[in-house]
Structures are given as C-alpha cells and as structure tokens.
C-alpha cells in the first residue's frame, strides 16, 4: 500500500482514455463503476473540450456483482457500437473491474463485430497513466498494422528519393492532456515544412484508425513524446525498419539538434546554422542587458521526464541559470533524468511523493521553481515564484493563445513564462507600498507573495478599517462577524455597499441584519 | 401526493461516487482525516473532484492498493496498519480517522470495520477510528456523507435533553443564521451534525428532534430513529417556500405558535422576495432540465418552478427516497417528470430533443452541452455554495440566472470547440 495525498499520474485506463479521446472514429468501452466517470471532466474541464470523451462506462453496481456482470458488459458494448459506429473499438477495464475478471475484451471479440477490436489489458495495481497511454497507442498501432507486417519490405529513410517526392514523416506521441501538445504539433509541422519535409500522419492527436494504417507511407517517425510514442516507434522500427528520432525539440539548442537529426536520417542538406539560430528571440532576449539579473538564478526542476530534462538544459545553457534540483515522477525515464542530473552536479529526485519534492525544494532554496501544478502549490506555500512546465496541469495551463513549448516559438514562450514570475520583484515592491490602500484586501495579492505574514498584515489593516468607517458609522460585533464570513474577494464590495446603504437609511450602527438588508437592496 | 410521474432508468451513468463527499466533509471537521482505502483511480478522483484547489496539505489521502495487497488479505491488513501508523505520526493533530471503503476494497472484501476496531484499541484516547463506504458500486456523490454520518452515530452519547438537531453539512455562515433564527423563535438548544469538530458529537435521545438540512441522508435518518430521535418531516430549506415550511415544521415540533414564526420570518421573506425579483425576470418561463447528481434536484426543481417560475422538463435524481422527499414532492407542480437513476445517453437524447434553456449537470457534461448551444449549471456548486435559507434564496436563484444572463450577453449559440 502506498499512501498518497496527491498523485502526479492517474490510473492506466485514464492513459487509454487520452488516446481514445485524441483520436477520431474510435470508441472505448470501459468496464467500470459509475464513479470512474469523473475522468471525463479532465478532458471537458482542464482541456475545455466541447465533446465528451468517446467512452462508454458499463457502470456496474454492487447488486450486479452477484449476477452476471458479463451480460452487462455485452449489453453496453452492443449499445455503444450501435450508437457510435466506431471504426475501431477499444475494450478495457478499470481497477475494480480488473478484480472481477470478466475479461470484457475477450467478450467483445466473441460478439461478431466486423471492426478491429483492441483488447486492452492495463494492470491497474502496478502501472500508471503514461504507461497506459503508451500501451494503448502501441496496441492500437499493432492491431491495425499487423497484417501488413509480412507483406511489406523494410522502409528506407531514403525512399522519398526513389519515389521522387518530398520526404514524409509521422509525428507520434501528442495527445490530449499532454503538456501544450496541440501547439507543439503546429510548430513542429511548420519547421519541418520549411525544411522541405511533409507530415504524413500526426497521431494519436487528431488521427483516425485509417491514418494509423497509413503510418508506413512515411519514411521516418518523429518520436515527439517518448512517454507515449516510444513503444510504438520501436515496434514500427522492428517490423517495418522505420527509423525514429531521439531529440526532443524543446529549447534552441535541442531544436537545432532535432533538425540536424532529421536531416541526417533523411539525407537532406541542412539550412545554414546562423539562420536557424535567429528564428527565435530567446537567444537575443537572453543576451540583452536586461537579462543580466538572470545570471546564476537558482532553479529547481520537477516534472515528467521529457520536460524536466529539456528544462534543465535550457535553464543552464540558454538562460544562464543554476540548476539546484532536478527530478521526475516518470519512473520509466529515471535513467535519463539521472544522467542529466549527474552532468549538472545535482542528485536526481525520482519520486511520486509531492511532499518529498516540497522538502527537496525547501532544502535547495531556489529562486524559481519549474514544476507541475503541484509544485506550483508547494512553491506558493514557500513564497517562491513558479512556472508550470509539465503535466499534471491546471486549466490555466491550457491557454487560449498559441503557446507551444517546442521549436522557435516554444523557446519564446519559455523565455516569457519562466522569466516573468521573476520580474515581479518590482510588482512585489509596489504591493508592499500600497498594501494599506483600500483596493488591497487579502485577495488582491500578487500570485507570488502568498505567504502567511503577508496575509496577516492585510487582514489586520482590513480590520482596523472596519472599526472606523469614514462616515462615523459603527460596525457592531454581529455586523463585523457577519462581514468576515463573506468571501474575501467580495468582502470589500459588500462592506462599501452596506455602509452606503446605512448612510442612505440613516442607520448609525451596522448589524448583521443591516448587512443582509443592504445585500437584498443592492441585489 | 400530486400527480408526479415517476420513472426509473438504468444504464451507463455519469455521476461521481460517494468518495466525493470527502471534499466538503474534511472542511467541515478540520480535526478529522479521511483515508480512502482504494486504488489510484480513487486517489485521482478526489483530487480531480476537489479541483486542483488544495492550498495546504489536505486532510484526506488514499492508501493505494498494490499487487501484493491483492494477493493476501492478511498482508493488506498489515499494510494498512503501517500506513495508519505513519499517518498518525505525521499528523498528531488528527482526532478522528475515517477509513473509507472503495469499490476495490469492497470487492476484495477488505474488512475495514475489523481494522478500525483493532486500531481503536491501540490508539485509545488519542484517535478514534470509524469506517464507512464511499464506493461507486454502492453510493453516488452525496451519499458518501450519509455513510460518514451514519458511522458516527454509534459514537454519540445518549441524553434525554430536549434539543433540535440539524443534520447535514451546511456552510458555517448559513448554520449561524439558522441558529440565530431558531433562537428568535424560542428554540435555544440547537446542535449540528456533523459538528464543526469531529470530537464534539452531539448527544442524542428520545427528546432529540431531528431536522434535516440535506435530502441525501436516508441511512443516517434511519439510525437516528433507532436511537429514539424524532424526525421532523419537512421540505428542505432551499428557497423561501422550502425554508419557511422547514422553520414551521420545527416550530410545530416544539409547540411554538405559528403566528410567531410568521412574525419573525416575514421581514426576511419580504426582503428575500425583493432580492429574488431580478433573477426571476430572467428565469421566468425558461425550461429547465436537471440531470441526476446530488439528490438536491427535486428541491431545486421545486424552488425554481414555484418561486422563479421556470418550467420543468425533467427532474433527474440518482436515488429517490420517496419517504424523505414526500413533502417536497407534494409541492411540485402536477405532471412533473421525475427520473430516478440514469442512462446518460438516452437522457442526453432527451435533452437535445427538448432543447431546454438550462441544464443542471455534472462537470463532465457541462462543456459538451455548452458547445451544443445549451446553457448549463454545474450541480457540484450546490454542495459548495451557501444556498440554504431564506436569506440565500436570491443567491441560489443567481446560480441559475447567471448562465442565462451570460448567454444573453454572448449571443453566439454554437461554437467551434477545440
Ligand atoms: S467508483 Fe469506486 S473505484 Fe472509482 S473512484 Fe469511486 S470508489 Fe474508487
Ligand atoms: S491557487 Fe491559483 S494556481 Fe492554484 S489552483 Fe487555485 S487558481 Fe490555480
């Protein structure tokens, strides 16, 4: 048993949902109790998706357990197929269903449908979300392409020359609930096309089962998010000889290296290096005199393997920071993260426990934290500025504007996102100067200085004001008590309104009743 | 009973499980800790349902079952022991520890009652252990609170003192208001269950008169009855009508003159009516579809129809206790269609067909419906916002008028979503 107060990754079937929801013409029947439907909100709320995930839950209940849950599974599969008419069906189970061993995948296969069925076995008690996503994508690729394995010969990365067309690549790994995947794909496609390279298929994001069957029309695969795509890339390499890339194009140096790698694999001549370096503002912004203050800033990094490693490299080599902590929750990437940490002379932190991360953060005493949503909270508690660089994320980490992490524009975004929290030093100053101003009730603080002392100061000054309102109106005990119960972000408004009301009505003392009267009056 | 149309539906659902109640229960009783014995899914659920709004170390957690725990139950018990020891060492301020069962722990028949019993002996005088199930194979959303409260009843001492016991978690400010009003009515011995501290459980007995504040407490009510408490039958204190009836029912149980109640409530009522006007203007004549989630749906439908003049297309509820809801159902308009249970696909078909102005639904469904041009309101907000009582009637209406108002401001109906 593992005690968890907060988890970085969901269960493996949530990973499977990420693949299913990323794609078209796919449906996933998930043998699960009703409560597991919460997972839908990850997509419809964090990602603000306008469609429900293509998932049908069997919703078995305790009273079904004695009877025939297998029948319930079949009924739900039948209904889902009739209603959604998917081109490919995924069938799997969540943690509870795994225990009752109905084997829904096998049941589905016995039902005589003519579409491909992928039977997902994702051990819920030993594996997690990213593994589940990777396994699902791999099983899907395998199922849809396995018939073509024997008939096809190995794919040469130079095939495009023989065929007399531009080289074609697949971009593999982007998925819903991945960090900024949607925009990364646009950026990478743009970069490749500038280099004369066409994109054959992007998957799973936006792909259909037909697209998966077309994967072998490309010369090489771009393994953009190894957490999700590496297993599939390996399989495609083993069975079709397709090469895949290793460099993740996050940061200027990695982007250039990535372009080099692709070019080498495809035997393309490379564009001039200087021109590439000028494609992003990061190098100049980082060099400009204003950035002097960034020198040697101490950063602490924690996230998924891919983003943490990339962040460490950018921090050190492109922004001139000092990396004082590096870690990941992706056990699958532990080896690579350790190697990167060793190069930076820090000890890698491989853990699932956010409290351990918070402790390490406290010890390292950084000036900036680059982490997940959870490190944002920890950093806030410690009063350290933070920027989110990896999942798990918050709805605010899915911005409306174009904001990739990869490629040239990604580097610009990274510069802004990492540096802006630091520049708030001036703002903090101003807030401190003006904190006795009426506007600065306890909700109106900068996102950084969320420390206890700060809040207390503001509360105290607020309280003083409550006692002596300008017009000589007195707040009675009950009135004041009632006012403190109003949420801080509207308290100021409620207070002013109530006083306004009291003056209007010639009420000298504000009680809780006055507050409610005023509330009703202004409603 | 009015001519209400009852329907039952089964099929795929879209409802949280009872674990979700932890989100408000742990805030109500800051000296308690909720330890879910479950899977990574359970951990992920409460974290997602709590939003990512955890500011401090939360007072809930999950002991995640692993492969080796499934192999042998003896080991699972030992492991749980170890986790509890660690937890208590780390959080010495915990006074009550709830061991919360989940689907996996129930399916493998992990006996949390026995575990709790053993731990109670070991930590005697330091921490109390209680257990209940919040599993999704047995409970939905708000029913977790029912389980937690029911589990506390055996710990409540007996007393024959006459008192009013308000049962169900309320926002603190609402609770204070209620107590004040009851005092004005002449009922001064009032206690709340759950209390604000888990260790300050009210004493109960045959002179305890129970007034429910939430409709989802069937099991708790049954056990309180067994302990001799008298259950006051009333609608729920949502809206002016429900709250007035609720106060009246309590007054009657305490033999307080009805006129006095009216005298005390009428200024509150007048002011609430005034406050309600602007919302009513927006809500009037609008068609409302409630999908099942919190069991508050029937009371909400009653309020939104009777006081805000909305038309009810369908009132879904995950579970219906006709006995507890008797007074509410009496107040519903004729021919109200109540649907217990859920087949989410068929229900959504009916939503689309009837094209309502507003749908009350769970968080997973809201954006997809908005994308189809249908305004929505999250039902989870009803359990997080102070909505009870006469003074809150306008706020309650405001929760529903806001999406419609917003819809009027932003005229685009169907949007391309990404
Ligand atoms: S439905 Fe069951 S398995 Fe799922 S989160 Fe709730 S208790 Fe856990
Ligand atoms: S505190 Fe700020 S960052 Fe954290 S969840 Fe709330 S809004 Fe998001």
From Swiss-Prot, chain A:
Pfam families recorded: Oxidored_nitro, PCP_red
The domain of life for this entry's organism is Bacteria
Task: Spell out the reaction equation it catalyses.
Answer: chlorophyllide a + oxidized 2[4Fe-4S]-[ferredoxin] + 2 ADP + 2 phosphate = protochlorophyllide a + reduced 2[4Fe-4S]-[ferredoxin] + 2 ATP + 2 H2O
Q: Which InterPro entries match?
A: ChlB/BchB/BchZ, LI-POR_suB-like_C, Nase/OxRdtase_comp1, P-CP_red_C, Protochl_reductB, Protochlorophyllide_Rdtase
Q: Which residues form the active site?
A: 290
Q: Which UniProt keywords apply?
A: 4Fe-4S, ATP-binding, Chlorophyll biosynthesis, Iron, Iron-sulfur, Metal-binding, Nucleotide-binding, Oxidoreductase, Photosynthesis
Query: Which molecular-function annotations from GO does this UniProt entry contain?
Result: 4 iron, 4 sulfur cluster binding; ATP binding; metal ion binding; oxidoreductase activity, acting on iron-sulfur proteins as donors; oxidoreductase activity, acting on the CH-CH group of donors, iron-sulfur protein as acceptor
GO BP annotations, alphabetical order: light-independent chlorophyll biosynthetic process; photosynthesis, dark reaction
Residues that, per the record, bind [4Fe-4S] cluster: 36
- Region annotation (Disordered) ranges: 451-470
Report the pathway entry. Porphyrin-containing compound metabolism; chlorophyll biosynthesis (light-independent)
Residues where substrate binds: 425-426
Q: Where is the signal peptide?
A: none
Cofactor section: [4Fe-4S] cluster
Report the EC code(s) recorded for this entry: 1.3.7.7
Q: Where is the composition biased (Basic and acidic residues)?
A: 461-470
SUPFAM superfamilies membership: Helical backbone' metal receptor (SSF53807)
Q: How is the cofactor bound?
A: Binds 1 [4Fe-4S] cluster per heterodimer. The cluster is bound at the heterodimer interface by residues from both subunits.
Q: How does it assemble?
A: Protochlorophyllide reductase is composed of three subunits; ChlL, ChlN and ChlB. Forms a heterotetramer of two ChlB and two ChlN subunits.
Report the sequence similarity comment from the record: Belongs to the ChlB/BchB/BchZ family.
Known function:
Component of the dark-operative protochlorophyllide reductase (DPOR) that uses Mg-ATP and reduced ferredoxin to reduce ring D of protochlorophyllide (Pchlide) to form chlorophyllide a (Chlide). This reaction is light-independent. The NB-protein (ChlN-ChlB) is the catalytic component of the complex.
Q: HAMAP family from the entry?
A: ChlB_BchB (MF_00353)
Specify the protein name: Light-independent protochlorophyllide reductase subunit B
Species of provenance: Prochlorococcus marinus (strain AS9601)
Q: What is the lineage of its organism?
A: Bacteria, Bacillati, Cyanobacteriota, Cyanophyceae, Synechococcales
Curated annotation (Swiss-Prot), chain B:
Functionally, this protein is described as follows: Component of the dark-operative protochlorophyllide reductase (DPOR) that uses Mg-ATP and reduced ferredoxin to reduce ring D of protochlorophyllide (Pchlide) to form chlorophyllide a (Chlide). This reaction is light-independent. The NB-protein (ChlN-ChlB) is the catalytic component of the complex.
Which gene does this sequence derive from? chlN
| Pfam families according to UniProt | Oxidored_nitro
Could you identify this protein by its name?
Answer: Light-independent protochlorophyllide reductase subunit N
E.C. no: 1.3.7.7
Q: Which UniProt keywords apply?
A: 4Fe-4S, ATP-binding, Chlorophyll biosynthesis, Iron, Iron-sulfur, Metal-binding, Nucleotide-binding, Oxidoreductase, Photosynthesis
Q: What class of enzyme is it?
A: oxidoreductase
What molecular function terms (GO) are annotated for this protein?
Answer: 4 iron, 4 sulfur cluster binding; ATP binding; metal ion binding; oxidoreductase activity, acting on iron-sulfur proteins as donors; oxidoreductase activity, acting on the CH-CH group of donors, iron-sulfur protein as acceptor
Instruction: Note the PANTHER family from the entry.
Output: LIGHT-INDEPENDENT PROTOCHLOROPHYLLIDE REDUCTASE SUBUNIT N
Needed cofactors: [4Fe-4S] cluster
Lineage at the top is: Bacteria, Bacillati, Cyanobacteriota, Cyanophyceae, Synechococcales
User: What GO biological process, any one, is recorded here?
Assistant: light-independent chlorophyll biosynthetic process
Q: Which reactions does this protein catalyse?
A: chlorophyllide a + oxidized 2[4Fe-4S]-[ferredoxin] + 2 ADP + 2 phosphate = protochlorophyllide a + reduced 2[4Fe-4S]-[ferredoxin] + 2 ATP + 2 H2O
Subunit comment: Protochlorophyllide reductase is composed of three subunits; ChlL, ChlN and ChlB. Forms a heterotetramer of two ChlB and two ChlN subunits.
Q: Which residues bind [4Fe-4S] cluster?
A: 17, 42, 103
> What NCBIfam families does the entry give?
DPOR_bchN (TIGR01279), PRK02842.1 (NF002768)
Q: In which pathway does it act?
A: Porphyrin-containing compound metabolism; chlorophyll biosynthesis (light-independent)
Name the species this protein comes from: Prochlorococcus marinus (strain AS9601)
- Binding note for cofactor: Binds 1 [4Fe-4S] cluster per heterodimer. The cluster is bound at the heterodimer interface by residues from both subunits.
> Which domain of life does the protein's organism represent?
Bacteria
Family from the record: Belongs to the BchN/ChlN family.
